[in-house]
From Swiss-Prot:
Its main location: nucleus. GO terms for cellular component: CENP-T-W-S-X complex; FANCM-MHF complex. GO terms for molecular function: chromatin binding; DNA binding; protein heterodimerization activity. InterPro entries: CENP-S/Mhf1, Histone-fold. The MHF histone-fold complex is a heterotetramer of 2 mhf1-mhf2 heterodimers. Component of the inner kinetochore constitutive centromere-associated network (CCAN) (also known as central kinetochore Sim4 complex in fission yeast), which is composed of at least cnl2, cnp3, cnp20, fta1, fta2, fta3, fta4, fta6, fta7, mal2, mhf1, mhf2, mis6, mis15, mis17, sim4 and wip1. Signal peptide: none annotated. It is found in: Nucleus. Transmembrane segments: none annotated. Keywords: DNA damage, DNA recombination, DNA repair, DNA-binding, Meiosis, Nucleus. This is Inner kinetochore subunit mhf1.
Amino acid sequence: MMEEERFKAEIFHVTQEVCNRTASELTESESRNVIVDELFCVGVTEMVWEQIRVLAKDIEAFAEHAGRKTVQPQDVLLCCRRNEGLYEIINNFHKESIKSKKKKKENSTT
């Protein structure tokens, strides 16, 4: 349980930073005083946490359906297939990761 609490605390911290930054930007651009309530950040954190849990279960189910016990990048890509922007970001990250590993392997053998 300690690890879960640590992850949730980190999500809360990032959520609070994003909300406060956005509030500051709105305050500057619209000349309105925008204040972020801490309970709002708690609510957003809970939504994000629950979404992470659902996503993890879906990714594990895709791997299991493919007859694997280990999650592969294609499971993650399959899970985000309906969000074109996210799919592109993750796919590009995966391709760059493969290229980087190949370069390291080539450099270590020469």
